[in-house]
């Protein structure tokens, strides 16, 4: 497959604006606020996937090596209650982060106040302080996600330089990205730079044939990106839960499968206009309930029963999709082919991952569940790029501006 060379320099992201990177700053003896993305999946107080932590290390180590005093900000999950605060305490990442950096990372359990300010003032060159989950500020008043001006200004007051390396939140205007960047000399980190270069390259000049794989649940969530990509892609292969809305729009029986009823008319119009581009499953795996104990069977789309739920694409659909993928030179994939978290319903996703890992093609995995599946199934190093941002990558490919980047462009 194609391997992209990433050159870390001032980055032209496809327009006249030039973004400064961390390498454009003198970091020695400076307090460097780095917005990272440590929004990792957690179960039973254990980190299930540390990919986002691992991807942040290059930027953090660079700041350490250049003599910076590093202050890390990140969110973890959503915080709408005191119980959410307990569940999403960011201190859980400290042991793994310390291990990866080879130093003892300090942690402040507060997002503001004298304790935080004192810990910042006591930092020595080359030391790292991780601040508590920025979304603690979302309860009860959504100050973080609402980009509260005072909060952004306060966090900015803690540092000398701001580096945004959290691509996964770049499509959001939050106090911890836009708010800080509006008040401080700012640039981007190595991860953000790589994400922008790779995804803008695909958006602006994809190698042809260009195939998009879309899965996941609701069509409505991806209408914008579908409208953008259907104009430039050669084929769009649709699997996962969203495929059943398209099949319903073609008057197919979908049993009790997931249906985005509000999007049926949209799907009808899209199929009518782009029938040769939109490729849908021809068979599926079905069951009566989604659980580890559920019995399942494979059947054609026409043979699904009223009480059955589609949970994966079938073997014939995999072979159909392979025909379009085999000649592709660019593949962008967002959304798994089925309920991949259950072993019996993961074969469609696994089979497509395996096939893509062995063809001569530029392959981009766009964040979220697809990235987690690729990593968990052992394909972490098999693709050109696995993005750390689901929504951010889709909005960039759609042609939208990313507020977290735009705030730095406009400095």
Q: Each predicted region: which residue ranges?
A:
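Active-site loop-to-helix "anion-binding N-cap" substructures in soluble metabolic enzymes
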Residues: 4-411
